[in-house]
Amino acid sequence: MTKKLYLPLLMAMVVALFSSCSKKMGELSADYFTVTPQVLEAVGGKVPATINGKFPEKYFNKKAVVEVTPVLKWNGGEAKGQPATFQGEKVEGNDQTISYKMGGSYTMKTSFDYVPEMAKSELYLEFKATIGKKVVTIPAVKVADGVISTSELVNNTLGNANPALGEDAFQRIIKEKHDANIMFLIQQANIRSSELKTAKEFNKEVANVNEAANKKISNIEVSAYASPDGGVSLNTTLAENREGNTTKMLSKDLKKAKIDAPIDAKYTAQDWEGFQELVSKSNIQDKELILRVLSMYQDPAQREQEIKNISSVYKTLSDEILPQLRRSRLTLNYEIIGKSDEEIAKLASSNPSELNVEELLYAATLTNDPAKQEAIYTQATKQFPNDYRAFNNLGKLAYQAGNVDKAESYFKKAASVNASPEVNMNLGLISLIKGDKAAAETYFGKAAGTKELGESMGNLYIAQGQYERAVNSFGDSKTNSAALAQILAKDYNKAKNTLANVERPDAYTDYLMAVLGARTNNSSMVTSSLKSAVAKDPSLAKKAATDLEFAKYFTNADFMSIAK
């Protein structure tokens, strides 16, 4: 009787034991898991998450091995993260051991490559468990929602970026000058008949400039000099007389030619600067010694004496250098006045061959009509095919029109002519908008000196998830991307100011303002801005309907009437 009762009792205990073990390795509550961030967010093209999990007390079978895999799921797809494996106390292995009695905590870091479908997704933990050779089923646990993808808007705001312009070097007024020298004999100030030919040729140039319709005389300078030999007192009188005689002659000639031009006259008693310049350019013996004397002594008399002491070269100086310093220099300063804006604009459309490359490129800046600008730049590529700027600027127009492939073609053509910093920067923008961050960074590295480089680097930093650095790089730039960086860096006041001053606002300007409204709890800003965005780009309604930036508005009737 006792044996009959004992056997069924033993079997019942075994069944109960296995039943108990199975329950302990069963479903885990979501309360045992926390995820940072609570709502997953795309950063630099990735969706990172830190998962803190816990196996409760008396749960983890001593012979169990459990593999935990983060899985991000969305409608029609999923992405798996790196799994982690845990083992019970009686398992021989190298994985983290979890105590049956005390349970155990663990931390997992995971990251998924972002795809747009993840905007409406859920993060699960999936379990693969065995006890010995027996497979144990542990249901998957949902631990987070995702994905806030605001950073990925950089792929859209890039279209609002400013490509670098190949700027013209047009100058309406170009300053020019014409020089002539009236030479004098040693210790003389009279103008010799042999020098009158020089004066006559100079006066002829003055007359030509005066008569030219596109030239204007500024003034004529008379600068008279004496060579350093002979003492300060003598040379002062000598230089003054040379200046006086030259000015008198020039004034007489101008009056005779009926030319009204101001004369600015001055004299230099001892032309040590001219002496030093001529010696430096010469091949005379002991040149370095002479130059050293000039640097060591400032007193004119001492300089002259020390140089005379270098007897080996003084005769050469007297014969070759000093005579060139006994002169009056005549300088005609005048301006070449270029075509007016009206003339350039008219010729650009009617007879562009009359314009040089700088004038033609400048003509494109006189209109805000992209079609007219394109026509001008196209003409420039025909007239000046070896100038990269027109090709580059056609690429800029195509980029701003949203035609990335056409822009790339023009930028590559420009690069084949001249791989300038501007062209490299623009090719970097193309690479960035096509998702090749490494190539973009390489191109930007060759774009030093371009005005727009800070803005372009700001876009790259957003794409890399470096938001504070992006804000600094944008500076005071007023673009959608600059505002996006400020939103991501949580500088909402600055972002609002930036969006209000975007030069070429578009649908994404309004969409970012709606995001800003959601982040600052301004419901009227959300609805009004989103309504404006959808009016410009209807596809943004569908995006807003699943954008977790607006999660708390998904039950708002006004919001849902727009995002439908």
Whereabouts are the PLM-identified features?
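N-terminal targeting segments with Sec-dependent signals, encompassing both cleavable signal peptides
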Residues: T2-M513, G517-T546, K552, M560-K564
